[in-house]
Amino acid sequence: MNFKYIVAVSFLIASTYARSVKNDEQSLSQRDVLEEESLREIRGIGGALLSAGKSALKGLAKGLAEHFANGKRTAEEHEVMKRLEAVMRDLDSLDYPEEASEMETRSFNQEEIANLFTKKEKRILGPVLDLVGRALRGLLKKIG
């Protein structure tokens, strides 16, 4: 009788343990699914912000390019125009990453483009980037 009781209790403990392991696995898989969904949402928001930022930068670069395209240009303005065209190509490459290798063959990279900006351009871009940053912070506060 004691042997049957020990076997029954052992079986009960084993089945309870198996059920708890199964429940743990299910809760982990549900947690993984929820984490994956939240990561997708975060990536979606990040992608939307990135595309908005790219659009704003493209618009700014196009506006500056049009400004320098009208009328006579000095040598300095011509150099600025060439740099803006390079920046536009880099912004376009963000939309089409498969063309990034082609960009490298033309010897354009982020560090070189960053070094091309003169102090005058930094004075122009600084306040613009500050305004964009403030706008993004305002949007994030409204969203959050």
UniProtKB/Swiss-Prot annotation:
Family indicated by similarity: Belongs to the bombinin family.
Cystines in this chain: none
Summary of the tissues where the protein is detected: Expressed by the skin glands.
Pfam families: Bombinin
Modified-residue entries (Asparagine amide), positions: N70
Propiece residues: 19-43, 74-123
Protein name: Bombinins BLP-7/GH-2
Keywords of the record: Amidation, Amphibian defense peptide, Antibiotic, Antimicrobial, Cleavage on pair of basic residues, Fungicide, Pharmaceutical, Secreted, Signal
Signal peptide: 1-18
Source organism (scientific name): Bombina orientalis (Oriental fire-bellied toad)
